[in-house]
Amino acid sequence: MKRSMYAGRVREEHIGQEITLKGWVGRRRDLGGLIFIDLRDREGIMQLVINPEKVSAEVMATAESLRSEFVIEVTGQVAAREQANDKLPTGAVELNVTALIVLNTAKTTPFEIKDGIEANDDTRLRYRYLDLRRPEMLENLKLRAKVTHSIRNYLDELEFIDVETPFLSKSTPEGARDYLVPSRVNKGHFYALPQSPQITKQLLMNAGFDRYYQIVKCFRDEDLRGDRQPEFTQVDLETSFLTEQEIQDITEGLIARVMKETKGIEVTLPFPRVKYDDAMALYGSDKPDTRFDMLLQDLTEVVKGVDFKVFSEAPAVKAIVVKGAADNYSRKDIDKMTEVAKQYGAKGLAWVKVVDGELNGPVAKFLTGIQEELTTALALEDKDLVLFVADTLEVANATLGALRGRIAKELGLIDNDKFNFLWVVDWPMFEWSEEEGRYMSAHHPFTLPQEETAHELEGDLAKVRAIAYDIVLNGYELGGGSLRINQKDLQERMFKALGFSAEEANDQFGFLLEAMDYGFPPHGGLAIGLDRFVMLLAGEENIREVIAFPKNNKATDPMTQAPSTVALKQLEELSLQVEEDETSKTN
């Protein structure tokens, strides 16, 4: 029979109606001769009642054979429950079954289909089709669909044009490692899966599209963590003839629309703007979480005269004050934080506690002469814990920024119901890579430098500033963008500053440079990480929870066993040969 409605949508208004439902058996209970079934579909759970006095012996026998995750079809009359279940939207009603058909049986599942399961991640991914049956996973993906629907409607209203760009593109040397695709037709040549549609969307501006968007898959072969996947989705925008402020206004409007339509939250516009240098100085991060205080304090000048060379001779001394937390952290706890500090390059972590108006701790004796000044500078009160890092400014900022976030989580200082958006602006154009031993693009090599610093492209690259902007939500980089270079000579200077010879630049980006000979308009844009955005809206801590079929932290899929080996014939067609490593040879 035709399904009447979703099980999770049956309400009191349907009492007395005969309906047909289809779904999965969530739970079966036998009570006083009656059989109760929780029927589950994507919209929720509906209680079924099978009464032996009102159904045939065949229906009763079928009901007795039901097990969890059997797929069934039932017909019956909606009735009011004697005792309502306030925890379910369908809790005021039940279905008195008159007909029952088993559409398919099921083996015992490797974990219960319910929220809050204890299965490990690889088991969940191995049986992802079962994991996705769980209500919280269904809700996460329904939320994702609502977000993308809201985004499309908003951008369509603003006359953005949805244009698909190629997945088989050219490998470029900047950024993360590419996923390469060998060409069978062009032996020895490779496509790259795009890390973003950056250049193609810029070329669409040159083509006169004016406003482009795409919700697009991107690929990066990089180390994984909770908010990264090898393939991910971004909301990609590009515009012509707009200022950075206008692009940011459009983006804020998009986010405000999504927040209202999916969470019922009105966000305050415009979002705060924080300069990059200020974000690093105050929060120790270029993606600051502003839901709590504990700002970094610069004490370099305050401690200059102390008889403690670690402080007095350090390039920078910075501190954070953990208010009222002196009793929360033992010496052993602080030793653990010291190990965290060392991971960020710090040589150690100094600390004092305020006890009965006095400073206590390993370095307290060196600070007695400046206790009053220190107390004023840090607004110290009894029971405060102060953590110091004496090192380069970069190390001090990064270390205390990491500790700030860790401590806030440990002490429950973060209001998880808050959504604090902000812009980080006035970025450096380049960042020094210890691994590469050179300056690299902080964003990408197509970012427009601020006019007043562009002359440093041939001088001190550390002084070049970009017209770039990142949007941050609760300590996560939600997205980033910039105005782009549209003048050929400036783009060539940028490539040269990054160490490209003219030949290398032409080999890698000649098509873009050539396009700049044909009236390339001023343009700029932005990309938002859709997976990360939905993760934060859903209150999850890993983007796997909002992606239907993600990879694990080894970039593999336990369900399909991808990546896998392929037949020798396939490799030969591609003129490829796999070399065994030494480990394989000895095993």
UniProtKB/Swiss-Prot annotation:
Q: Which residues bind ATP?
A: R220, D221, E222, Q229, E477, G529, L530, D531, R532
Q: Record's Gene Ontology CC terms?
A: cytoplasm
List the catalysed reactions: tRNA(Asp) + L-aspartate + ATP = L-aspartyl-tRNA(Asp) + AMP + diphosphate
Aspartate as annotated region, ranges: 198-201
Does GTP-binding count among this protein's keywords? Answer: no
An annotated GO BP: aspartyl-tRNA aminoacylation
- One MF term in the entry's GO annotations: nucleic acid binding
Signal peptide from the UniProt entry: none
**Which InterPro entries does the record cross-reference, listed alphabetically?**
Aa-tRNA-synt_II, aa-tRNA-synth_II, aa-tRNA-synth_II/BPL/LPL, Asp-tRNA-ligase_1, Asp-tRNA-ligase_1_N, Asp/Asn-tRNA-synth_IIb, AspRS_core, GAD-like_sf
* Assembly, per entry: Homodimer.
Q: What is this protein called?
A: Aspartate--tRNA ligase
Q: Tell me the classification of the organism that encodes this protein.
A: Bacteria, Bacillati, Bacillota, Bacilli, Lactobacillales
